[in-house]
């Protein structure tokens, strides 16, 4: 009997020890899983932060050119998968701060940064929530507006001109008058006979940049947009870009002019 009792007690002790070991093992596994999940969450958060930082301009917190290129590449892939592929759709606006080099040279880089930040804020406030505002580089910005008709695009460009140039920008060196030049176009461009002319998004950016150059060449503090293009095909469009001024003079390209605040 004594031996049997001892065996039972020993079995109980072994059972308790095994149970304790199992509980300890489960606790260790739970802690390990929790730590792994926390590490994975930190890794995911860090990756998201790095991705966001790589796609944002640190000064203005706008999208940067890299983000815009990624968005356009994805849209191009989506278009290529569709049967009704007729190229880039949407409106583009290129915005350049007038005489920005003078701001840096005469008032310093702190004033220049203040101007960049405030102009970015005014652009963002003047567009729709669905529009993508990009710091394109230096003092230049790009706005991509999906599904925006040409008439509404002109209204938006006028709103941005007046927002930027309407009131001085406060800087560490005091208030500065700032104006901008804008080039804008809605795509696809209408060809002769009403047919839509297919363009890749990079070509669309070139057209917006071309009318921005026109706005700057004609005096700045203004917007120039494309109202109509007389071109039967893509080859004619390419030829127009080679001599844009001549195409405007002979009315192959008809422009819309917006004047900024006096």
Where are these regions (language model features)?
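Short regulatory alpha-helical coupling segments
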Residues: 49-53, 65-88, 120-128, 146
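A short pre-motif secondary-structure segment
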Residues: 125, 132-135, 176
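Cyclic nucleotide signaling catalytic output domains
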Residues: 133, 181-218, 224-250
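Signal-transducing coiled-coil linker helices
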Residues: 1, 9-58, 66-78
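Active-site-proximal structural segments of metal-dependent nucleotidyl cyclase/transferase enzymes
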Residues: 71-107, 123, 134, 258
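Hydrophobic framework residues that shape the active-site pocket
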Residues: 96, 100, 119, 133-136, ...
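Alpha-helical scaffold within the catalytic cores of cyclic-nucleotide enzymes
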Residues: 120-124, 152-170, 205-209
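Conserved nucleotide-binding and Mg2+-coordinating catalytic segments in signaling enzymes
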Residues: 50-70, 95-109, 117
């Amino acid at each position: 009997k004594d031996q049997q009792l001892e065996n039972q007690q020993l079995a109980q002790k072994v059972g308790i020890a095994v149970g304790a070991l199992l509980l300890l093992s489960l606790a260790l596994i739970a802690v390990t899983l929790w730590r792994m999940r926390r590490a994975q969450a930190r890794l995911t958060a860090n990756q998201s932060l790095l991705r966001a930082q790589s796609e944002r301009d640190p000064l203005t917190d706008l999208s940067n050119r890299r983000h815009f290129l990624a968005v356009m590449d994805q849209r191009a892939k989506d278009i290529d998968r569709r049967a009704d592929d007729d190229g880039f759709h949407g409106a583009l606006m290129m915005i350049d701060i007038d005489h920005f080099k003078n701001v840096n040279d005469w008032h310093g880089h702190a004033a220049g940064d203040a101007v960049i930040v405030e102009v970015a804020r005014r652009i963002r406030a003047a567009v729709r929530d669905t529009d993508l505002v990009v710091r394109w580089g230096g003092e230049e910005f790009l706005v991509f507006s999906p599904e925006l008709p040409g008439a509404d695009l002109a209204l938006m460009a006028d709103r941005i001109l007046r927002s930027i140039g309407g009131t001085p920008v406060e800087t560490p060196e005091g208030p500065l008058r700032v104006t901008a030049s804008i080039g804008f176009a809605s795509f696809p461009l209408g060809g002769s006979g009403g047919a839509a002319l297919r363009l890749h998004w990079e070509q669309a950016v070139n057209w917006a940049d071309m009318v921005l150059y026109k706005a700057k060449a004609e005096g700045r503090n203004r917007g120039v947009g494309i109202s109509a293009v007389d071109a039967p095909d893509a080859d004619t469009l390419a030829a127009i870009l080679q001599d844009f001024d001549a195409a405007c003079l002979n009315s192959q390209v008809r422009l819309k002019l917006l004047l900024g605040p006096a």
